[in-house]
């Protein structure tokens, strides 16, 4: 079993800790709490780069090793990093558990060293008809991010 963690921070006061657990060749379970967000849905994605030299803007596009278009987590045609939305309550906090088979912590498509990003707006899961739907889910700006590292 492999474990990972990402600590999210932002200049807007968004904070959180995300934990990743990967069992052998199975799915990865993502659990976390993020606070300081506007209530509602917020796009949640693994981005290709672990570079935060320019804040969340330098984390690159969604992690997409198979060259697919953006989609929902349950879609066959989706970026590996497309994790859908997290739901933020009236208190500005999201607590969530996501299980996904396309984000391993080892092997050629490992997400270790990449970034996890929370977006300002809901992810339309590639179905919104907007010009950005098939690339970003039209999820808006990047409000918080953290680099995924291995955890002992």
From Swiss-Prot:
Which SUPFAM superfamilies does the UniProt record give? Cu,Zn superoxide dismutase-like (SSF49329)
CDD domains the record matches: Cu-Zn_Superoxide_Dismutase
Query: What pairs make up the disulfide bonds?
Result: 56-145
Q: Where does Cu cation bind?
A: 45, 47, 62, 119
One annotated Gene Ontology cellular component of this protein: cytoplasm
Q: Record-annotated residues binding Zn(2+)?
A: 62, 70, 79, 82
- Documented EC number(s): 1.15.1.1
Which keywords are on file for this protein? Antioxidant, Copper, Cytoplasm, Disulfide bond, Metal-binding, Oxidoreductase, Zinc
Question: According to its UniProt record, where is this protein mainly located?
Answer: cytoplasm
Keyword set includes Metal-binding:
yes
GO terms for molecular function, please? copper ion binding; superoxide dismutase activity
Give the cofactor note: Binds 1 copper ion per subunit.
Question: For this protein, what reaction is catalysed?
Answer: 2 superoxide + 2 H(+) = H2O2 + O2
Compartments (UniProt record):
Cytoplasm
What cofactor does this protein call for?
A: Cu cation; Zn(2+)
> InterPro entries of this UniProt entry?
SOD-like_Cu/Zn_dom_sf, SOD_Cu/Zn_/chaperone, SOD_Cu/Zn_BS, SOD_Cu_Zn_dom
Function, in words: Destroys radicals which are normally produced within the cells and which are toxic to biological systems.
The family assignment reads: Belongs to the Cu-Zn superoxide dismutase family.
Please give the subunit comment from the record. Homodimer.
- PANTHER family from the entry? SUPEROXIDE DISMUTASE CU-ZN -RELATED (PTHR10003)
Question: Can you name this protein?
Answer: Superoxide dismutase [Cu-Zn]
Q: Which gene encodes it?
A: SODCC
């Amino acid at each position: 079993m492999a474990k990972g963690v990402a600590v999210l921070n932002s200049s807007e006061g968004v904070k959180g800790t995300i934990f990743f657990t990967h069992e052998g060749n199975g799915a990865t379970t993502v659990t976390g709490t993020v606070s300081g967000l506007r209530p509602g849905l917020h796009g949640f994605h693994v981005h290709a780069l672990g570079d935060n030299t320019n804040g969340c803007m330098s984390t690159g596009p969604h992690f997409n090793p198979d060259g697919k278009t953006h989609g929902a987590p349950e879609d066959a045609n989706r970026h590996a990093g497309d994790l859908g939305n997290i739901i933020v309550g009236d208190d500005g906090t999201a607590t969530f558990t996501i299980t996904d088979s396309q984000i391993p912590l080892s092997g050629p498509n490992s997400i270790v060293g990449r970034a996890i990003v929370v977006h300002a707006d809901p992810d339309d899961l590639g179905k919104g008809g907007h010009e950005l739907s098939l690339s970003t889910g039209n999820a808006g700006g990047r409000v918080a991010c953290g680099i995924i590292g291995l955890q002992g």
